[in-house]
Swiss-Prot record:
This is L-lactate dehydrogenase. It comes from the Bacteria. Its cofactor is FMN. Keywords: Cell inner membrane, Cell membrane, Flavoprotein, FMN, Membrane, Oxidoreductase. It holds the Pfam family FMN_dh. It is found in: Cell inner membrane. Its EC number is 1.1.-.-. Catalyzes the conversion of L-lactate to pyruvate. Is coupled to the respiratory chain. FMN binds at residues 106, 127, 155, 251, 306-330. It catalyses: (S)-lactate + A = pyruvate + AH2.
Length: 381
């Protein structure tokens, strides 16, 4: 099929990977209303076209936490990437590095830290959940430091897992999930060969390295559910702040007061995020939450945003709303699923071209030039 956008990669991914894996990435929680609003609320923001400005020196580069980024995009932490393409975390990290961007490794990755970092020269970011097993948290932080990871992304919006009904329908969870997955793999032979056979081991590499025993896909949801800590508070994060030498980013902020707490805590950055609509259905979209948060803490802390970004125009919209940079998740997972590293690299090229068009036609030659004057809220016209 012809690939022209992230939406095309979504369709290509739907065809290539088994339903239980596709819908795990594609779906949200409960009725998926927040998942839908993440996209629609961005689409409701028209870009204000301005003309006859000199755009010959247009530049998408930024600096973030001492790193140069070719554009204000970071590949977000996504669990089990190695189930979408053979050793998927390695391929995604290499694609990001080749395009001048950071890659964030998830706590629940298939490939462990020690497999991904030797495959790239650029320091990657590492994502950590709040878990009951503090021994695991300390161990994996030590491993991340030893491997040269530059930035810690601390996810705080999962004290309990969201109810993802689509997973019950797809075979990711629920009754007879094992046999359903086998049958699905049989009808997706390219995935079965590339990932199912040649992509082994299918374990949570970072977790298995700590426990000393294999923690596989069937153990994934159980391990997470058993280890999420609903008692967590800001005080519990203090030892992590003291232990980690580099920048620390708090991911999962949707409220102004929480953003202010992050500043008081001493975080270097926040991610305005509703976990891609995968946690609290009914929560604000990131596009709706971002402006008030930016008004409250911009300049005191770096603001990143995710959830709902499907193209380069959406990146420009998030920057205009007050973000310093963005994270993208589903868009690169679709591309990775469809075409591996080459797919992710091509998708990032598409995003860059879309950003160039948007910046040129809104007369913003630098990322720092973009502000809310570039937007028109269609719901208020």
């Amino acid at each position: 099929m012809i690939i022209a956008s992230a939406n095309d990669y979504r369709e290509a991914a739907r065809r290539r990977v088994p339903p239980f894996m596709f819908h795990y990435a594609d779906g949200g929680s409960f009725s998926e209303r927040t998942l839908a609003r993440n996209v629609s609320d961005l689409a409701d923001l028209a870009l204000r076209q301005r003309v006859l400005k000199d755009m010959s020196q247009l530049n998408t580069e930024i600096e973030l936490f001492g790193e140069k980024l070719a554009m204000p995009i970071v590949l977000a932490p996504v669990g089990a990437l190695g189930m979408y393409a053979r050793r998927g975390e390695v391929q995604a990290a290499q694609a990001a590095e080749n395009k001048g961007l950071p890659f964030t490794l998830s706590t629940v990755s298939v490939c462990p830290i020690e497999e991904v970092t030797p495959a790239i020269k650029r320091p990657m970011w590492y994502q950590l959940y709040v878990l009951k097993d503090r021994g695991f948290m300390k161990s994996v932080l030590e491993r991340a430091k030893a491997a040269g990871c530059s930035t810690l992304v601390f996810t705080v919006d999962m004290p309990t897992p969201g109810a993802r009904y689509r997973d019950l329908h797809s075979g990711m969870s629920g009754k007879y999930k094992e046999i359903r997955r086998v049958l699905q793999a049989m009808t997706h032979p390219r995935w079965a060969w590339d990932v199912g056979i040649n992509g082994k081991p299918h374990t949570l590499g970072n977790v298995s390295g700590y426990t000393g025993k294999s923690v596989g896909l069937d153990d994934y949801a159980v391990w997470l559910a058993d280890n999420f800590d609903p008692s967590i508070s800001w005080k519990d994060l203090e030892w992590i702040r003291d232990f980690w030498d580099g920048p620390m980013v708090i991911k999962g902020i949707l409220d102004v007061e929480d953003a202010k707490d992050a500043v008081r805590f001493g975080a270097d950055g926040i991610v305005v995020s509703n976990h891609g609509g995968r946690q609290l259905d009914g929560a604000l979209s990131s596009a709706k939450a971002l402006p008030s948060i930016a008004d409250a803490v911009k300049g005191e802390i770096k603001i990143l945003a995710d959830s709902g970004i499907r193209n380069g125009l959406d990146v420009v919209r998030m920057i205009a709303l007050g973000a310093d940079a963005t994270l993208i998740g589903r868009a690169f997972v679709y591309a990775l699923s469809a075409a591996g590293r080459a797919g992710v690299e091509n998708m990032l090229d598409i995003f860059r071209k879309e950003m160039h068009v948007a910046m040129t036609l809104t007369s913003n030659a630098r990322i720092s030039d973009i502000n809310r004057d570039a937007l028109v809220d269609l719901t208020k016209i």
